[in-house]
Amino acid sequence: KHGGATVFQPLSTGITFALTEKVPADKIPLITSGYGRSDTADGSMFKWNFPLIGHYWVAGDTVLQHIAKTQGGWDKLKGKKIAVVFHDSAFGKELLPIVTERSKMHGFELLLLPVPAPGVEQKAIWLQVRQQKPDFVVMQTWGVMTPTAIKEAVATGYPREKMFGTWWSGAEPDLKDVGAAAKGYSAVMMQH
């Protein structure tokens, strides 16, 4: 009342997790646009959270739908292997429930590859990709982690045409210095 915040928009998944527990008592709406806790889309459980224009489950599912479409349908993913390279944080792990559920529904194998912050040391991750030979790689990355992943994919010979990112994984400022090495890489995007 009188001088307090009318709304929180933290612009951070980690902060969103912390505030989600606090906003019901404070009765201040928490707005997230494309980030935050995906499970807050259930308004019956999270009455003070308002995830606008999608969340990480939407991004992950959109990527998986695209992969399924390029293969001729969901049934064609049965027996395939999809690696998920993700930032080892609340942000990165947000993708895991939807890819895990889709894996169970459609019979593809998941290879989960967490990358510790800040994401500049990925050689071991991409050696695993080379050894495990996934049919596709889905990336839940951001910042320096994204160009590092693409450079390591090049170094290990993994084709960028089989790499797909969620929205922060396609940020132009993060990819511009990679140049031609990123050719073939795709990411779903909100307006950036």
Regions found by a protein language model. Give the residues of each.
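Conserved residues at the C-terminal ends of beta-strands
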Residues: 10, 34, 85, 116, ...
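Short, well-ordered alpha-helical microsegments
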Residues: 15-17, 122, 146-148, 170-175
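N-terminal (or domain-start) structured segment
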Residues: 1-6, 11
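Short gly/pro/ser/thr-enriched loop/turn and capping motifs at secondary-structure boundaries
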Residues: 36-42, 58, 169-174
